[in-house]
């Protein structure tokens, strides 16, 4: 006997007031931002970084990073937008690339810390864990938009029904790569919280290095499962960038361990 399996797909629109639509995608990003900022302001005093400095940085970096993430995505997906230029501005439909946001945010952070006479690595060490938790939450925006998913699989019975149903796309269950990356970032955040409380364990800049290696490794593996990777000359751009992050992070640790004058992170 044939049976019809019922599936409940979630509406990507959370609130609709006339022409105004607020999407879950935006809510997830904002929730990640708010929690990340809160955690950074709590940790900042350990490096003598004022709350006002963190808030001022976010007010500048967040909109520019979203813009950078969109430009990055459009640049590598130009064929989707060249015939409808106005769709470039429809960012609420999804289509931002984390690496574009990270690159833009890093540039803004460098100039901001130089202008405020703040040690750049100290600021990075405070911000990096917050970025991880923000990414962990923000990835759920992809869940609601049914994007950034993986290859087709026979079943997802190991997942709760609400995730399983949402990952039924184009007639097949899809690997929930958004979930893999969310959990990976959450685990990385937890490890950082433990490691930075150990006396004389992490040196200045090594929390940043940990983020680069941890996120780079996770993204390198997870990106290989996705079906919507941004490509350039037949290459998955994010995997190459992940390799660069890993290499930079390892070099940072090696160089800093060779210098006894570099201070340890104070728990």
Curated annotation (Swiss-Prot):
Q: Where are the transmembrane segments?
A: 20-40, 57-77, 88-108, 117-137, 175-195, 205-225, 235-255
Q: Where does a 1,2-diacyl-sn-glycero-3-phospho-(1'-sn-glycerol) bind?
A: 139
Q: Which InterPro entries match?
A: Lgt
One GO BP annotation here? lipoprotein biosynthetic process
Compartmental location:
Cell membrane
Functional summary from the UniProt entry: Catalyzes the transfer of the diacylglyceryl group from phosphatidylglycerol to the sulfhydryl group of the N-terminal cysteine of a prolipoprotein, the first step in the formation of mature lipoproteins.
The record, for HAMAP family, names: Lgt
Q: Which family is annotated?
A: Belongs to the Lgt family.
Q: What is this protein called?
A: Phosphatidylglycerol--prolipoprotein diacylglyceryl transferase
Organism, as annotated: Streptococcus suis (strain 05ZYH33)
Instruction: Give the gene symbol.
Output: lgt
